[in-house]
Amino acid sequence: MMTDPLSRSHAAALDAADPLRALRDAFVFPQHGGQDQTYFVGNSLGLQPRQARAMVSEVLDQWGALAVEGHFTGPTQWLTYHQLVRDGLARVVGAQPDEVVAMNTLTVNLHLMMASFYRPSAERAAILIEAGAFPSDRHAVESQLRLHGLDPDTHLIEVEPDAADGTLSMDAIAATIAQHGPRLALVLWPGIQYRTGQAFALGEIARLARAQGAAVGFDLAHAVGNIPLSLHDDGVDFAVWCHYKYLNAGPGAVGGCFVHARHAHSNLPRMAGWWGHEQPTRFRMEPQFVPSPGAEGWQLSNPPVLALAPLRASLELFDQAGMPALRAKSEQLTGHLEQLIHTRVPQVLQIVTPADPAQRGCQLSLRVAGGRTQGRALFEYLQSVGVLGDWREPDVIRIAPVPLYNRFCDLHQLVEHVETWAAA
């Protein structure tokens, strides 16, 4: 007799056969009623890798034993500590090692990148973003325009959603880039839209922007560690991201930055700091700034070693699993959840995120029948029973099954609780 592919027993069989199942044990889960919480919020804050504590302790022990000499001696000297995460990050984002650096935080890095790559002229001064962009991106863009004496009402162009669910078609993006091409100095685009969960064809967007003579940058906050990326091959000028979501580096973690290799030895103007000076002569303390080649030349201050340690722990797990395997499981998990919703609670939940797996990561953005009031009620009920998603105003519950630690059975637990709530 065939097993129902949407049954609990089939989900348990999928979990038992999952080649990545052991990775779940590498994370610390919050507890609810003495059991692991069912956690779907890796798109907001990833779980703590168990090895993170040991790697942070290693830094603390080295600090205690060596003090300032820890910069130059010890098992992991701090002078080059940031380079311990470089190769792993390059693999995750599809870059060469010298194109990436872990530094600062996302919006700080965005400002640094715009200082170099947003170079407005009288004819070409506009910045293009998506309507409904994450507020920090919009604040950064508007402030950069004002720093150049430009009016955001005139020089900030937004691509409006052209679908009823709030998503954006590639046709709309391409048409807007073509319409405003001669005016565009910069196209700044997300890898995944934070509210809808829509993923974009980044290579195509980069090609369209560069064909119009605009610089192109990506905010990969919701894409890095979630979907396959190929920043070098896509030809993007720069990208920025955070590490506290899918990269599991902890609250307020150090950010990440990509600068394409074609800019490695350029004389681009930049906001400079001493840690961006070339390493061989940095400690001569000479007044002339000589940038390190590649992305490291945009560093300002010495790296936050304690904050980098959890990122090391997480990247080891990414290397252990590999992005292709993680993506394959992610598509299975999110597709399974989509089927469960359509089959068992279609009258309760509407999926906002595109159905095409190529246009989404692991996140499904959900609206609840009855609007915001009912949505909040369901969200709070799920919290009360130990199932954690997150809420985004005005009316979206985001659920992100993360392949590193979520199971197929978790999806059934979620949907069963939705059924219980709806029947009450």
Swiss-Prot record:
Pathway: Amino-acid degradation; L-kynurenine degradation; L-alanine and anthranilate from L-kynurenine: step 1/1; Cofactor biosynthesis; NAD(+) biosynthesis; quinolinate from L-kynurenine: step 2/3. The gene is kynU. Gene3D superfamilies: Aspartate Aminotransferase, domain 1 (3.90.1150.10), Type I PLP-dependent aspartate aminotransferase-like (Major domain) (3.40.640.10). One of its GO terms (molecular function) is kynureninase activity. One of its GO terms (biological process) is NAD biosynthetic process. This is Kynureninase. The modification N6-(pyridoxal phosphate)lysine is found at residue 245. Pyridoxal 5'-phosphate binds at residues 106-107, 134-137, 219, 222, 244, 274, 302. Homodimer. It is an enzyme of class 3 (hydrolase).
